[in-house]
């Protein structure tokens, strides 16, 4: 059974304690009414994983756990089988005692692009909105964060996160809650807020920016990563039914337009830190994610376009500060 009591106890002692006015009731309602039909199967996979304390843990350069002596073939097979019961694995990679989870996305590449532009994360309390399986939460801890909290309503991601946590020695420096940003009160409590790969899924992107701002302390830093198109500050793509086969894509601005949106929402010191085209090496089908991936979403005759004829995915990282 996946429980959240450790997180409640943790925040009861710090500046997030006011979150306890709403959070336990929200989680209790989720446990009663909103669990996915496969949630028990997924949580059982987590339950059956062995409890291991890593002899060597690297969260600075990767998410890697090693034991002092190699695990037996039977132990490795058990871990591998249970983790495969949690497929598809989209965000990673993870290397856990010799079991290498080769995820759809090379999320480590994104982290390498983002990290040089961040304020020092040492001692910070961080919120990662739409955190997926929590890969970047662990990298934030590796970069020195005091506490990394992720929110994502996708319940498979919660189980993947808890599986990795268990194999990292039940590390309590990172936590994932099965919530969306709209369920959070205006906590104004996080030193850094990340929103990566979320904005284009929001029907009201400016509302999302305001919601992110409401989670930051004064002088806090926002890290925003999202799809963009080429163009000036007035350029925004509004796709039709689908973009790269995704139905729920609403607005894809240019990077200059996104900078203007952030300034309109009251952020300051806004800068475009990085823009890059997503490649089929960074997002691809693997044995841990066996369905279609980016190569299937691009025009086979012109890789600069999606199958719908839109510009192929490129992503920008913007950094901003709340005054």
UniProtKB/Swiss-Prot annotation:
GO terms for molecular function: methyltransferase activity; transferase activity, transferring alkyl or aryl (other than methyl) groups. It catalyses: carboxy-S-adenosyl-L-methionine + 5-hydroxyuridine(34) in tRNA = 5-carboxymethoxyuridine(34) in tRNA + S-adenosyl-L-homocysteine + H(+). Carboxy-S-adenosyl-L-methionine binds at residues 91, 105, 110, 130, 152-154, 181-182, 196, 200, 315. It comes from the Bacteria. Its EC number is 2.5.1.-. The keyword Translocase does not apply. It is an enzyme of class 2 (transferase). GO terms for biological process: tRNA wobble uridine modification. Gene3D superfamilies: Vaccinia Virus protein VP39 (3.40.50.150). Keywords: Transferase, tRNA processing. InterPro entries: CmoB, Mo5U34_MeTrfas-like, SAM-dependent_MTases_sf. Belongs to the class I-like SAM-binding methyltransferase superfamily. CmoB family. PANTHER family: METHYLTRANSFERASE, TRNA U34 CARBOXYMETHYLTRANSFERASE. Homotetramer. Catalyzes carboxymethyl transfer from carboxy-S-adenosyl-L-methionine (Cx-SAM) to 5-hydroxyuridine (ho5U) to form 5-carboxymethoxyuridine (cmo5U) at position 34 in tRNAs. This is tRNA U34 carboxymethyltransferase. It comes from Salmonella agona (strain SL483). The lineage of its organism: Bacteria, Pseudomonadati, Pseudomonadota, Gammaproteobacteria, Enterobacterales.
